[in-house]
């Protein structure tokens, strides 16, 4: 879509591209991010208060501010502020900007607990096309979603001449109607690397790391900081407090599509034993522009005689879901391997999004919603049982 499709808001130095994400591990903090064209007094401040209050309890936080240059582009001023000690299940208003350019939004930190219901939207490889707009519209039309798990590949700026950085701005405006009101949890994809030696841009992830506060460095061997970080993160998980263990990656480990076939294999070989050992419930991936859901399988037992390995059903293993079907500019990946392998439970070359409804510590309901004209159609669904509390076989 053209830049005119997602214009900046009216008003002098108006804040734009507003998005929020979780700011701490206990659910009482939120990172508020926004962009202004100028770095004037007050443009880096977020003011927030409880919606039901009389306004006398307003609090303000000053953001950290940065900008970056990329080839012939200079970004606006990128602001990130952490608001803390929020009350659970309480609606807050927050306000950005000054004077007549003030903009107001709201957010609600959820109640926490092992049996508290919570619904995630799941999107990957979104981009900013007509199909992308349909995906986001369909997700927002369902009132259930409380946060979005995003499996990488955001703006697709690198698919345009000289990695057109204005596409990052239009993308931020595009997702703002959702991302300003509920947390989007981002994973980085290959389109976030933005490495372009031919135009002198050799710092990987420059736009992404300036715009989004999440881990972004990729690892290619078993001795990197990323490897140690993941081991430490698994140790921190307390399944009595957070029963469901969900992992976001970008390149899928189980993929029966001809596109990007086995590109995640080296990562799978390294990390899959940890996922099985720690009883990961679900792994969401993007990268392949189609939809696929696996059986619970693992591929960690190698045949000593021939050196081959074969995925086998494993009730301690995650379900692997490829959700790179958001609608990006590169189109759908419509060539699957034939016959369909036994580890693949459902696959379809269509755009769409998913909902993961956590019901309690033992059960969750998962649905994939195919884009169809002006509505979303449930094309795949399954009741999931928690691997830690109820490692039993599931049924559709």
Swiss-Prot record:
Gene Ontology CC: extracellular region
Keyword terms, alphabetized: Glycoprotein, Hydrolase, Iron, Metal-binding, Secreted, Signal, Zinc
Reactions the enzyme catalyzes: a phosphate monoester + H2O = an alcohol + phosphate
Localization per Swiss-Prot or TrEMBL: Secreted
Positions annotated as active site in the UniProt record: 260 (proton donor)
Cofactor note: Binds 1 Fe cation per subunit. Binds 1 zinc ion per subunit.
Protein name: Purple acid phosphatase 5
InterPro entries named in the record: Calcineurin-like_PHP_ApaH, Metallo-depent_PP-like, MPP_PAP, PPA-like, Purple_acid_Pase-like_N, Purple_acid_Pase_N, Purple_acid_PPase_C_dom
Pfam family, one: Metallophos_C
Tagged with keyword tRNA-binding: no
UniProt-annotated binding residues for Fe cation: 125, 153, 156, 289
Residues spanning the signal sequence: 1-13
Keyword hit for Signal: yes
Cofactor(s) required for function per UniProt: Fe cation; Zn(2+)
Family according to the record: Belongs to the metallophosphoesterase superfamily. Purple acid phosphatase family.
Chain positions recorded as Zn(2+) binding sites: 153, 190, 250, 287
GO BP terms in the entry: defense response to fungus; defense response to Gram-negative bacterium
Quaternary data: Homodimer.
List of glycosylated residues: 58, 133, 238, 303, 360
Protein residues bound to substrate: 190, 287-289
Enzyme class per UniProt: hydrolase
Main location: secreted
One term of GO molecular function: metal ion binding
Domain of life: Eukaryota
EC number(s) from the headed UniProt entry: 3.1.3.2
């Amino acid at each position: 879509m053209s830049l005119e499709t997602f214009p900046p808001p009216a008003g002098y130095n108006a804040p734009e591209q507003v998005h929020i994400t979780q700011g701490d591990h206990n659910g009482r903090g939120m990172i508020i991010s926004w962009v202004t064209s100028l770095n004037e007094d007050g443009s880096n401040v977020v003011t927030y208060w409880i919606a039901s209050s009389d306004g006398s309890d307003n609090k303000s936080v000053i953001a950290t501010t940065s900008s970056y240059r990329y080839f012939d582009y200079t970004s606006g001023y990128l602001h990130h502020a952490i608001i803390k000690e929020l009350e659970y299940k309480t609606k807050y208003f927050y306000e950005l900007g000054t004077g007549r350019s003030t903009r107001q939004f709201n957010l609600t930190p959820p109640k926490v607990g092992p049996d508290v219901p919570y619904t995630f939207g799941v999107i990957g490889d979104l981009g900013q096309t007509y199909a992308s707009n349909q995906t986001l519209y369909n997700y927002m039309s369902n009132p259930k979603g409380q946060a979005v798990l995003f499996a990488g590949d955001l703006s697709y700026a690198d698919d345009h001449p000289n990695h057109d950085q204005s596409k990052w701005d239009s993308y931020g405006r595009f997702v703002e109607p959702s991302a300003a009101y509920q947390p989007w949890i981002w994973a980085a994809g290959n389109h976030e690397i933005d490495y372009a030696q031919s135009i002198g841009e050799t710092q990987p992830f420059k736009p992404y790391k300036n715009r989004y506060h999440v881990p972004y460095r990729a690892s290619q061997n078993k001795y990197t900081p990323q490897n140690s970080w993941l081991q430490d993160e698994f140790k921190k998980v307390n399944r009595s407090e957070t029963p469901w263990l969900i992992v976001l990656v970008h390149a899928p480990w189980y993929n029966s599509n001809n596109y990007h076939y086995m590109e995640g294999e080296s990562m799978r070989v390294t990390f899959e034993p940890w996922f099985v050992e720690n009883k990961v419930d679900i792994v969401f991936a993007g990268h392949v522009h189609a939809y696929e859901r696996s059986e619970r399988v693992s591929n960690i037992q190698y045949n000593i005689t021939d050196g081959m390995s074969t995925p086998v059903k494993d009730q301690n293993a995650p379900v692997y879901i490829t959700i790179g079907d958001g609608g990006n500019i590169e189109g759908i990946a419509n060539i699957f391997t034939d016959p369909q392998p036994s580890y693949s439970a459902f696959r379809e070359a269509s755009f769409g999004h998913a909902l993961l409804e956590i019901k309690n510590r033992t059960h969750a309901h998962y649905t994939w919603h195919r884009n169809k004209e002006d509505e979303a159609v449930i094309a795949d669904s399954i009741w999931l049982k928690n691997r830690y509390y109820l490692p039993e076989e599931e049924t559709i």
